[in-house]
Amino acid sequence: MYNLIKPLLFRQDPEKTHELMLGILSKWHRTPLSLFWKQNVASKPVRVMGIDFPNPVGLAAGLDKNAECIDAFSQMGFGFIEVGTVTPVAQPGNDKPRLFRLTEDEAIINRMGFNNDGVDELVKNVKASSYKGVLGINIGKNKNTPEEQAIDDYLACLNKVYPYADYVTINISSPNTPGLRNLQHGSSLDGLLSSLKTAQLTLAKEYERYVPLVVKIAPDLEDHEVEVMAQSLLKNEMDGVIATNTTLSRDGLQSSQAGEAGGLSGKPLQDKSTRVIELLCKTLQRKIPVIGVGGIDSVESAEAKLKAGASLVQVYTGFIYQGPGLIRSIVSHL
């Protein structure tokens, strides 16, 4: 069914199409229209970070920023769903146009800039959902928050989402918020992770429930930077790491829109992200699980991430290009 409507969808503006589909999914998931995307997916349970996942294929953050469509995405058979990135206060994001399809490259460039309705609205939507599966909530800082005060934004979000998340992702790797990637390095990283770890342990006592903290990193790090970051993750007892976010690289692109600013996702990111996963797993010595994401568009590309050492995988751009059938295909062949 998706292959029938995809040409029509791809003729429209990417962001308008995105908004249209989210509107349909959020409003129609309880009606017969949901039969267009509902599917049975094989059970391939895996336990990671103390959490039982029905299968290892998840939805990456960024598609459902405000947690409006959790129920619909669960009907597609995802093993877990990650919503956000969410910030303490609602913000409009960057100027439009800010989302570009590179169909010749099976890729997307985005410079959205953490557009979202704010953490309170996301929590309201999560509470209204009937979803009982594994939910990750991805948190970030507001654009106008100075870099030296970023910790306050992450702590504010963590405090509000903690009771409703199965894990919380700390997004310090989007290329579309000025200064954000600086938090991946040195004392900035250690200070942030240390503060969040302290808050996590306090919240775990308060709610009598331990919610893992996961850090999402960029693919554009040098090898020694990945190794230093891995040591910081171990030192601050993080529970997981997502590798990777979008890339600033434009190597080998064919599309006329290749020069647009923003983060690149999709097939061109495939090998770059897998290489980071391999290096991370080697440095971490499997003491911290890795969630692999970046260019997964087939059984083979998912298996490459798992072979590199990832315990779970996430899809986004491949899902946009191929639809829900990608989930079932990957899970059934793992």
UniProtKB/Swiss-Prot annotation:
An individual GO BP term: 'de novo' pyrimidine nucleobase biosynthetic process
The EC number(s) this enzyme carries: 1.3.5.2
Residues that, per the record, bind FMN: 61-65, 85, 138, 171, 216, 244, 266, 295, 316-317
Involved pathway(s): Pyrimidine metabolism; UMP biosynthesis via de novo pathway; orotate from (S)-dihydroorotate (quinone route): step 1/1
UniProt binding sites for substrate: 65, 110-114, 171, 176, 245-246
CDD domains: DHOD_2_like
Function statement: Catalyzes the conversion of dihydroorotate to orotate with quinone as electron acceptor.
HAMAP family reported for this sequence: DHO_dh_type2
Family: Belongs to the dihydroorotate dehydrogenase family. Type 2 subfamily.
Protein name (database record): Dihydroorotate dehydrogenase (quinone)
Organism the protein comes from: Idiomarina loihiensis (strain ATCC BAA-735 / DSM 15497 / L2-TR)
